[in-house]
Amino acid sequence: MANVLVAMSGGVDSSLAAALLQEAGHQVTGVTMHLWDDDEQGLRESLCCAAEAATSARRVCALLGIPFYVFNYQREFRRHVIEYFIRAYTHGLTPNPCVECNRMIKFRALLDRARALGFDAVATGHYARIVRDDCGRYQLWRAVDTEKDQSYMLHMLGQADLARLLFPIGEYTKQQVREMAAARCLPSANREESQDICFVPDGDYRNLLRIEAPESLIPGPIVDLEGREIGRHRGLPLYTVGQRRGLGLGGGEPRYVVAIDPARNALIVGPVEALNRERFIVTDARWVDDAPPAETFHCQVQVRAHAEPLPARVSAQPDGRWLVELERPQRAVSPGQAAVFYDGVRVLGGGWIARPEVG
């Protein structure tokens, strides 16, 4: 049996993960990562990095009779996640802080610390599955519960990571998880789920930008696809590709943000049809098998956390980037978001959607 460190948010998923591992005979220790001061932006108690999370996790560990610790990662979280988040928006990109938090905090800093402390593995309450093939290689699969599947957020994990990770609840649906937690009298069985972006109060990232980067909110032109100025924006970081509301363009045909051009401080808008993309570039690709399947391969690509995966052809480019060609157009492919490649339920890898060249 293994000595396992379980990352616990105080919620039902990580609580049940700890309980299942203990029942399987493993030596289990719980840990909550303190990422963000509750008072810094007025966070709700339900958020995964709030102090209430540590209190809830401690209560679960006491019930299970296992050790519990809190690791402070506030400095790393600000540097690798919050500053990345702000920097992306100020450069006209739409960031995905949960992917970056997984990459830099949960599956780098925590894995490194667990190794240094002598733990054999780290477990989390993510909805995903780790499978070993006939050759002993690790594969990352979608969760059984496709509605809750989080494999998109984990695409950056490689062989060395997967060898030391456990996802105990990936084989269950959310309903089953709640029922199993209730059967074990876990206090988190009916706890409210944490929000996706834990450091954004009330879900409005614009308030964070106004506080953290007010100098980036420089007004500029809103232009149509022909380059004609038709309005003024309040600062590029306040807008995302696909946005319609809040443009202040008055009546007439609905217009959407089609592209963001930081070089000209311009917001480019057009009809809904202009949002469709059939080709885009992916940068900084990482592969679950530590290498791409081939220089050119067919797969399904997912461009947002809950988007439908679409058939695509992916081909390596001379500059190290990857060209993705979709079989049918996808609306609002947002630069800065992750594009994740799948072969059915199996994650192949993924990278970041690059900004298209703007004329």
UniProtKB/Swiss-Prot annotation:
Alphabetical list of Pfam families matching this protein: tRNA_Me_trans (PF03054), tRNA_Me_trans_C (PF20258), tRNA_Me_trans_M (PF20259)
* Active-site residues, record numbering mapped to chain: 101 (nucleophile), 198 (cysteine persulfide intermediate)
Renumbered to this chain, region (Interaction with tRNA) spans 148-150
Q: What class of enzyme is it?
A: transferase
A Gene Ontology annotation in the biological process aspect, one of them, is: tRNA wobble position uridine thiolation
Cellular component terms (Gene Ontology): cytoplasm
Which SUPFAM superfamilies does this one have? Answer: Adenine nucleotide alpha hydrolases-like (SSF52402)
Q: Does this UniProt record's set of keywords contain Secreted?
A: no
User: Where ATP is bound, by residue?
Assistant: 7-14, 33, 125
Q: Where is this site: Interaction with tRNA?
A: 126, 337
Q: Which GO terms describe its molecular function?
A: ATP binding; tRNA binding; tRNA-uridine 2-sulfurtransferase activity
Covalent S-S links between cysteines? 101-198
The EC number of this protein is 2.8.1.13
Sections of the chain in a coiled coil: none
Q: Which UniProt keywords apply?
A: ATP-binding, Cytoplasm, Disulfide bond, Nucleotide-binding, RNA-binding, Transferase, tRNA processing, tRNA-binding
Predominant location of this chain? cytoplasm
Output the HAMAP family linked to this UniProt entry. Answer: tRNA_thiouridyl_MnmA
Q: What does this protein do?
A: Catalyzes the 2-thiolation of uridine at the wobble position (U34) of tRNA, leading to the formation of s(2)U34.
Task: Give the family per the record.
Answer: Belongs to the MnmA/TRMU family.
Protein name, entry field: tRNA-specific 2-thiouridylase MnmA
Q: What organism does the UniProt record list as the source?
A: Chloroflexus aggregans (strain MD-66 / DSM 9485)
